[in-house]
Amino acid sequence: MYIVQARPITVLPPEWTLPEKDVIYTKGSLAEHLPNPVTPLFATLGLEIVNRASALLWIDMFGKSAKKLLPENGAYTIINGYVYLSANSKPLLIAVKSLSPRSLRRALTNSVARWETARKEFEDVIKQWEEKPMHMLNAHQIMEGIQTVFYGACIYFTRIQFTLPAASISETLFTKFFQGAARRAGITDTSVLLLGFDTIALQSEKNLWDLSEWAKQNNTLGFYLKSNPATKIAEDFKSSILPAEVSQDVWIEWKSRINAYFKEFGCTAYEFDFAYATPQEILTPTFESIKAFLEEKGENPYLRQIAFEKRRKQAENEILQQIGGHRKKLFLKLLHWAQNTAPMRENAIYLMGMGHPLIRRMLQEISERLLTGGAISHLDDIYWLTKTDWKRS
């Protein structure tokens, strides 16, 4: 027997006081893409824009009921630094039950085309501000650009809320109706029927594979990449000094190819709070992937896709042999619906942070000016300012 003295309690955990009564709070929708405590700038500037865009979505979904649904703080609120989706509890139950057939039908039809339209509109907003010479804009104009692009990101998110349900519902219906036929065909997991499509994420991986194959053809570059950790490669990439192991021509071409990769596939974000660096800034994971391919530790994405496509088509034929007549027509209809919408869902989420690299470049420009003027001590201090502090600076 051991006698152990308990340590005295010196600090009590913070009390989670709810901002409003009779309000439901959940980590759903956009709050899922904000898993960490948000910075003061996002809490006071970003969340205001998020709520403005979300209010339009709620009006679109619930019509006149939206006003009763929305809490005083808006659809999203902060509790102890974390963002939560919120709604007035009693009106929510009534509103969900009274969702119009029109709203449901719109969410389930033409989802891919509507996502492509939302994507194009968001891309146009980004392009408009990317073309502006940032060094010639004053602070007020840059601030306007940050808010415009982020509002575009929020509107894009609200638009895809009317497209993503088609992917999940089509997969659910397909599985429910044909799980028995799949089992009889020896297929235990129907998700095999939705794999192997050329999503943006897969295209990105194939591009990295191509970069590794090109590097193999340049012995000195290949040796350099294998011999150095990804952190060192990232440092050298950002440096103006040429690595001793690689010729200038090869290094210039290497940097050009990497920059082209980031231009095509780096327009995304790890988190929706714009205080977090994007893949274009954190180079290490990209170089780790290339190193894995070079060292033959990573699977060839081209071969993997071919294997998935082969297995998918084989599974389709095996299930078709188990059914006939009207069930076969229904199977093909639901299958094609699920196969059209599943890649769209992945691509839509991938592009949520499409504007974040530009937003962070604009914030960097303002931060450098504040640093030069002595308003802040470090570049990242800008994210710890509130909206009021920011305007005052």
Q: Which role fits each region the language model picked out?
A:
Residues 5-393:
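Contiguous hydrophobic, helix-prone segments at protein termini
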Residues 1:
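Feature captures the catalytic cores and cofactor-binding loops of soluble hydro-lyases/lyases
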